[in-house]
Amino acid sequence: VHAETSTGAQSDAKSLVEIAHKYNCLAIVDSVTSLAGTPLKVDEWEIDAIYSGSQKCLSSSPGLSPVSFSERAADKIKRRKTKVQSWF
């Protein structure tokens, strides 16, 4: 979670992504409350997957979810060998 509106807390997404990559993990950022409201440099920070919601900081109609995947994440998804067992 990049930011939390009820407390005003914001994580250091850049550092968390660096830690994930250090251990060869993908980094996912929940930017529902931060996209368009605070600096968020998806390409520069090399975020692998990021999603948001239109109803929060974007202040738009609810029901839309902007999503972006890096080439690294897309490649990992394409190479998946097992089906997703559950979406819940």
In which residue ranges do the predicted regions lie?
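Active-site C-terminal subdomain of aminotransferase-like
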Residues: Q55-F88
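Short, well-ordered, mixed-charge alpha-helical segments that flank or form enzyme active sites
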Residues: T5-Q10, L35-P39, E44, L58-S61, ...
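Poly-acidic low-complexity segments
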Residues: D12, K41, S86-F88
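Conserved active-site segment immediately N-terminal to the catalytic lysine
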Residues: D43-Q55
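An acidic intrinsically disordered interaction segment
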Residues: L26, S31-T33, K78-V84
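Alpha-helical scaffold segments in soluble metabolic enzymes
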Residues: S15, K41, G53, P66
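Active-site phosphate-binding strand-loop segment of PLP-dependent enzymes
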Residues: V1-V32, A49, C57
